C-alpha cells in the first residue's frame, strides 16, 4: 500500500442544485472537500446578493452533521445585474465571484448574457473592486460548430473583453481545448483556468463510439484526444493558473437517458480517486496537491486549508456505486472506464 497526504482540497466549480437533489449530493462533496465555488444556475437563477444568501442557508442546512464545508457563493450575471448589489455582496464577504453564461450555452442559461455591452457597468465595477468573473467560455451562435465554440469564444469575446478591461480578473472555467490552455499560458495577467476531472479522462469518442452514451455528455462537450492531452499537461504542470473545478453536475437519469438529454456528469463521489489515478499515470503525484488544494485558493485570495486528507493506493479496486439515489431520482455516477485503486482513507 502507498499513502499520499495532501491538504484538504477545494472544488472551484460545483453544481449542487436545490431541494431534494441538493440534499442527495451534498455529502459527496462535504465529505472530502473544504470549500467549493457554487454555481448559480438554478431555476430561477441566483441573481442578487439576497438570492445568494438564501441559497447559502439552504446549502448549510443540507450538510451532514460533522462535515466541515464552506459554500462560496456566486451571482448569475444578467444584462440587468445591479453593480451596487454586486459590490455590496462582495464587500460583505458573501459573493466570491460572478458567473457569465452566454445565453443558451448550457443547463439553465436562458437568462444569460446576449449582449456583453449591456453587462459592462457591472463588469467595470468588478474590475475596480477585484471581484473575479467566472466565464462559461463558449459562443452559442448557430453557425459555429459545437467543437469550436471555445476557440471562437476566446477570439471574439474573451480577448476583446480582456483588452477592454485589463484589470478584470477572469476564471476561464472548465477549459476543454489546447486553445484555452495556450491562451491562459500566453496571457499571464489576471487570467486563470479550472479543469474538470472528466475532461482529463474522456475525449469525444467516449460519447459517440459504440452507441450514444448520454452519461458522458457534458457542456462544454469533450473534444479530440489532442485537447485532452493538453489539459493533462496543464493540470500536472504545477502552473498556479490551473486548478480543479469538477463541474460535477447531477441530473436524474430520466433527463439524461432521453431523446434530448441534459448536459452534465456527476463526479463528486469519485473525483479524488480518479485524479490520483491520472496524476500517477502521468508520473506527477507530487503535483496533485497543487492542482487540488493550492492553486485555487491562491487565485481566489484565500488561504490553503490546514487540514489534510490521506489517499491510499490499494490492490483491490475501490468500489463506488453505479448510481446514487436522491429524493429527486437516481443519478448515474461517472465511470472512468478503468479500475480505481486510490481511496480516501482519512478526511
Curated annotation (Swiss-Prot):
Keywords, ordered alphabetically: Hydrolase, Metal-binding, Pyrimidine biosynthesis, Zinc
GO biological process: 'de novo' pyrimidine nucleobase biosynthetic process; 'de novo' UMP biosynthetic process
Swiss-Prot/TrEMBL cofactor(s): Zn(2+)
Residues involved in Zn(2+) 2 binding: 99, 136, 174
Residues that, per the record, bind substrate: 15-17, 41, 136, 219, 251, 263
Record field: catalytic activity: (S)-dihydroorotate + H2O = N-carbamoyl-L-aspartate + H(+)
Oligomeric form and interacting partners: Homodimer.
Protein name per the record: Dihydroorotase
UniProt source species: Rhizobium meliloti (strain 1021)
Amino acid at each position: 500500500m502507498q499513502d499520499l497526504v495532501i491538504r484538504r482540497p477545494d472544488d472551484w466549480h460545483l453544481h449542487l442544485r436545490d431541494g431534494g437533489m441538493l440534499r442527495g449530493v451534498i455529502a459527496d462533496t462535504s465529505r472530502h472537500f473544504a470549500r467549493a465555488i457554487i454555481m448559480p444556475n438554478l431555476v430561477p437563477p441566483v441573481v442578487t446578493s439576497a438570492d445568494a444568501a438564501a441559497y447559502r442557508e439552504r446549502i448549510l442546512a443540507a450538510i451532514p452533521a460533522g462535515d466541515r464545508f464552506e459554500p462560496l457563493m456566486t451571482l448569475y450575471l444578467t444584462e440587468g445585474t445591479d453593480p451596487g448589489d454586486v459590490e455590496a455582496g462582495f464587500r460583505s464577504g458573501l459573493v466570491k465571484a460572478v458567473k457569465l453564461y452566454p445565453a443558451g450555452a448550457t443547463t439553465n442559461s436562458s437568462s444569460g448574457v446576449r449582449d456583453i455591452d449591456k453587462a459592462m457597468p457591472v463588469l467595470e465595477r468588478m474590475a475596480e473592486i477585484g471581484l473575479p468573473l467566472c466565464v462559461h467560455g463558449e459562443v452559442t451562435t448557430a453557425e459555429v460548430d459545437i467543437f469550436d465554440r471555445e476557440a471562437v469564444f476566446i477570439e471574439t469575446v474573451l480577448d476583446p473583453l480582456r483588452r477592454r478591461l485589463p484589470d478584470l480578473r477572469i476564471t476561464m472555467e472548465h477549459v476543454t481545448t489546447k486553445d484555452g490552455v495556450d491562451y491562459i499560458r500566453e496571457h499571464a495577467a489576471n487570467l486563470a483556468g479550472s479543469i474538470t476531472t472528466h475532461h482529463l479522462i474522456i475525449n469525444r469518442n467516449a460519447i459517440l463510439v459504440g452507441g450514444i452514451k448520454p452519461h458522458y455528455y457534458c457542456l462544454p462537450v469533450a473534444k479530440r484526444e489532442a485537447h485532452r492531452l493538453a489539459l493533462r499537461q496543464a493540470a500536472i504542470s504545477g502552473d498556479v493558473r490551473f486548478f480543479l473545478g469538477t463541474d460535477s453536475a447531477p441530473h436524474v437519469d430520466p433527463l439524461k437517458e432521453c431523446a434530448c438529454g441534459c448536459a452534465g456528469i456527476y463526479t463528486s463521489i469519485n473525483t479524488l480517486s480518479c485524479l490520483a489515478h491520472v496524476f500517477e499515470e502521468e508520473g506527477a503525484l507530487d503535483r496533485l496537491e497543487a492542482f487540488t488544494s493550492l492553486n485555487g485558493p491562491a487565485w481566489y485570495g484565500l488561504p490553503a486549508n490546514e487540514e489534510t486528507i490521506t489517499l491510499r493506493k490499494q490492490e483491490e479496486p475501490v468500489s463506488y456505486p453505479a448510481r446514487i439515489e436522491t429524493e429527486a431520482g437516481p443519478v448515474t455516477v461517472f465511470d472512468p472506464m478503468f479500475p480505481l485503486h486510490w481511496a480516501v482513507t482519512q478526511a
